[in-house]
Amino acid sequence: MRTATIKRKTKETDIEVTVDLDGTGVANAATGIGFFDHMLDLLAKHSRIDITVKAVGDLHVDFHHTTEDVGIALGQAVKQALGNMAGITRYATVLMPMDETLTRVVIDVSGRPFLVFKADFPRDKIGEFDTELVREWFQAFAMNAGVTLHVETLYGENSHHIAESCFKGLARALRAAVAIDPKTAGEVPSTKGQLGG
């Protein structure tokens, strides 16, 4: 069973995240941030990873701490659920359209955390959600999941569509990269014999 639960509590947030990499895409996101919950629901649905997120944060300050800390906890949960990464496909490339928007997401589930994020949002906010927090979430997720992640919106005009294409692109890339490759016969997909360094 490739599952994990992470609990993270600070003075700013109290978060519990559970993932099942071999799930069916069931989502249960409750962060108190409507748009963010929508993105997490998309992530679960299109990755086919079951994701439960319960978060209580200092939303009276702003959405930054909750968004970033959910990224941290979700990344840690994915990393823990992957274990030694034996048998995974490891790499994936996705082009994700959303109406006028097209985003490219490339992932290497390598144990080597890195993020390249290139997306220009026409607006500062989507509803009450600061668009700069999209990058903050991806940074927190990539660093804590231990993945190399390149996210680039090639073009787009609507901020909601841009954010959605980024999350859906990650979802489909994760779905492919963490899938078990029957040709590897359970081997770690690296000439080093291990991933993570």
UniProtKB/Swiss-Prot annotation:
Q: What reaction does this enzyme carry out catalytically?
A: D-erythro-1-(imidazol-4-yl)glycerol 3-phosphate = 3-(imidazol-4-yl)-2-oxopropyl phosphate + H2O
Q: What class of enzyme is it?
A: lyase
Entry's CDD domains? Answer: IGPD
Pathway it acts in? Amino-acid biosynthesis; L-histidine biosynthesis; L-histidine from 5-phospho-alpha-D-ribose 1-diphosphate: step 6/9
Molecular function terms from GO: imidazoleglycerol-phosphate dehydratase activity
Localization per Swiss-Prot or TrEMBL: Cytoplasm
Supply one GO BP term. Answer: L-histidine biosynthetic process
A single GO CC term for this protein reads:
cytoplasm
Major location category of this protein: cytoplasm
* Enzyme Commission number(s) of this protein: 4.2.1.19
- Name of the featured protein: Imidazoleglycerol-phosphate dehydratase
